[in-house]
């Protein structure tokens, strides 16, 4: 990476991390703290308050992605962070569950993922884009694991309202990073050069990746519905769960960093892509078998989590990179908007379906369903054509062709 690429990658990863930290801190404590609000004893209303964020995200990813194509990435990112901060303040003040739900909806309306990812693609070359996306993925995954450790003592100190106020502060800090640290974005293309939304949505290669990220995050959210109970069955108290997640994430990133970029440079990205899906399927199958044991060994669960995160982190880095390569510069905001829309819908469906499967079929039934869904994804992905090469690979192929002619 060049110095400007490193600066852009680090700054945009920091924006993602600041925003996601505010969200992830809520996950382990929201349902427990919501009971203190009027109506908080109704699981459906609590679930709506938690999940409506994903719904408004899904509705606005494409419009805001297209807006970033038209009016500029940084302008849309700033507006989205401001809206996220306003929603956080509404939720911090909320005297009732209805106001809390409104605050969460406003948070979700600040749907900047497509614009941030498109800006990262604009500021990096093909050859290093997967590495840049991986840096964003690392920041999000580490933020998630860290939040599971620090959220319980933090909410005990400041309450749920205090957590929402903290998310507003983090959003404002993100706005400062956009204004002062992120490099200037490249000039926008004229309106006539921009592709239509229909062109992006009908691209079968992008559709495969969009379907893939939907399945990936549906499986991930369903996993978190059942995994804490499985760790309790293994004899690990809830206060220590976050450390298992953190260690698994760190170890998985070490493996991904050692293998992914090296294999991508050698032209094996398709094999890595399919292998990562296979690892997730293997992890889900192992979790199904572990659940059937009644009291699974903790070491086995840790190993399966490690395998899951290798696959998950690899796909989180490679899929948006591929979307940005397949879409032209004039399409990136719209294409990544579609991608992030399906990602948000995956969150929503995974949480709802995971809860329903757990209620109907138990933990082992949930993981069996996740295994089947992942195997279906592997089957669909197997028919993908050769994935686009990065710039060095294309140059190498051109040189080889020249040598052959001479």
Show which residues each predicted segment covers.
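Intracellular juxtamembrane helix-capping segments at the cytosolic ends
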Residues: 112-124, 314-327
